[in-house]
Amino acid sequence: MINNRSVIIGIVVGENSGDILGVGLIRSLKKCFKKVQFFGIGGFRMRSENMECWYDISELSIMGITGVIFRLPKLLNMRRELIKRFLKLKLNIFIGIDFPDFNISLEKRLKKYGITTIHYVSPSIWAWRSNRVFALKEATHNVLLLFPFEKSIYARCGIPNQFIGHPLADEIPLYPNKIALRQKFDIPSNRCCLAILPGSRPKEIQILTKIFMHCAKLLQDTIPNLEILIPLHDTDLINQFVTLTSFISVKFRVLHTLTAWEVMAAADAALLTSGTATLECMLAKCPMVVAYRMNPVIFMLIRHLIKVKWISLPNLLAGKPIVQEFIQKKCDPQRLASSLFYLLNYNQEQRTTLQQEFYHLHRSIKLHANDQATRLILKYINLL
């Protein structure tokens, strides 16, 4: 039912993954109102839905402690400006999507001014910096959770929450059509194909591209006609990737696409960095190797704070190691190539067993996330 009330909603996202979540939520909310306006910070997807963005996510997207320190004065100024503008608009509700170090502090201040705040995507308090849960309790009226293992943490701390599943699980089919996707990307049905995703941030691309592509070279030397596909959506990242690989004699195709999961579903295996890409790969039912490397000094400083055995979402969701992970020194071309060679030569029984694991995990988070989030937001602005 469409409501005639005029509603003003503030949203802030800090990364591409938040832009994806944000645009789905905006589309769902638009169905409920005759007049609804969105203001804040978003990416091109959210702008395409007529959200008024005062800053672009590129101005927030940073990586590492040094990046935060260098950008701190600008970030603080942005936060002050956002608070001033949101108060002037008299928001009905504010939704901070992920990006916790910025959004939680913003939510805390808005809440003190009487604005209802929702935090969408739990910080990885189950992995490290668990004290952030207390900041969330002070800053927000409710937390929207994407994964089932998060709910018990919030229940123990007495923080209002709702497990809504993940929008990507609603978007990606339970049984991706590999044949059709191979036709879409012009991949012969009998061609062995590897998807490589070296990251979504410039720093990740800088660190991981050479390692990943030297791995690809080792595999192409071993597997005749192995096709390497690189799905990237950002022109700057594509240019950076091509520059970094210019001296490595490996054949590959860069696919300028917003739906990397389709490329992974078409591939026989994938090599990717940790993060949302591991979830997409699982939902695409594609065998994967997960790798990550960061500044060794930073890693030494934070290693004792990390509380989980695994970094990839498939392993965290399964509660056991169903995909291989290679971190820091173990993230080298030889180890990655050896593991991928094994995956690329999976027999049908091995492939089916892994895909069934992925299928059951997919079902566990396929819960109509945008609809659930919308209903909760309507309750908080007294429309349900």
From Swiss-Prot:
HAMAP family: LpxB. GO terms for biological process: lipid A biosynthetic process. Its EC number is 2.4.1.182. It comes from the Bacteria. Pfam families: LpxB. Condensation of UDP-2,3-diacylglucosamine and 2,3-diacylglucosamine-1-phosphate to form lipid A disaccharide, a precursor of lipid A, a phosphorylated glycolipid that anchors the lipopolysaccharide to the outer membrane of the cell. Belongs to the LpxB family. Coiled coil: none annotated. PANTHER family: LIPID-A-DISACCHARIDE SYNTHASE (PTHR30372), LIPID-A-DISACCHARIDE SYNTHASE, MITOCHONDRIAL-RELATED (PTHR30372:SF4). Keywords: Glycosyltransferase, Lipid A biosynthesis, Lipid biosynthesis, Lipid metabolism, Transferase. InterPro entries: Glyco_trans_19. This is Lipid-A-disaccharide synthase.
